[in-house]
C-alpha cells in the first residue's frame, strides 16, 4: 500500500448538504485553499455529533486560517438534512456535510470499513495544491478534538516555505 501522506487528493464528486441546500462537491472545489476532510461513522449516533459540533464551534477560527471543513460519512445527503432538521446541535454546522453512500471516497482514502459499510474517524488536512499534509485515523470509539486539529493545521501552514527537519 502506498503512503497517503504527501500524496495528491484523489478525484471525487459527491452530493452534500450545507445551509439548508443540496449541492455537488468535487475535489476541484478544494484546490487553491486549505481543506479538512473529517470522516465520521454515521449520522444519528452518540460520539459523532460531539465532534461535529466541536468543529462547528471552531469554524470561524478555521475560516480565519483560510481553511474549509468538509465532514464526510456514508450517509446520504438526505440523511444529513434529516439529522440537521432533527437536532438542535447539528443545526450549528455551517460547513458542507458530504455524502459518500457508495463508500468510494472513504475507500480511496483508506477509511472504509467493508463489514460495516461506514468510515473510521479519519481526518485529512489538504494543502492548496491538493496534497494531503496531515493524516489522523482513529478507531470509532476514540473521538477527536478540534483544538488539536487547529494546532496541526497551523503547523502544516507554517511548514510551507521552511526547511524540512
Where are these predicted regions, by residue range?
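Chalcogenol-based redox active-site neighborhoods
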Residues: 1-162
